[in-house]
Amino acid sequence: MKYDVILSDIAQDDLRYFKRNAPNCYKKALRLLAELLTHPETGTGKPERLRYNLAGYWSRRINEEHRMIYRINGEQIEVHVMSMRYHYVKV
């Protein structure tokens, strides 16, 4: 099954920031986004289902400082990426 990956405005800004200021994070984020197309619950970046106030969201590690936060909508076969910088502060 192939998912549509939708980036929030914040996630788009984060990706542009990585492209300008952190090329390694940019490359890793692109690899993670490519994986989300086919298997959003498994793969690299240690996918983790979040709990408590972020229940329903998933996280993947870009590096020690940054996490990709996303929500999977299986009914519409979509993955909504909420943010990519820092640890869960913009969700």
Language-model features, listed with the residues they occupy:
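Enriched for short, Lys/Arg-rich terminal
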Residues: K2-D4, Q12-K27, R60-R67, R71-V91
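Low-complexity, intrinsically disordered regions enriched in charged/polar residues
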Residues: D9-Q12, T44
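PIN-domain endoribonuclease scaffold, especially VapC-family toxins
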Residues: K27-A34
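Short alpha-helical linear motifs
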Residues: R31, Y52-A55, Y70-G74
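A short, surface-exposed loop/turn module that caps and links secondary-structure elements
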Residues: A34-R60
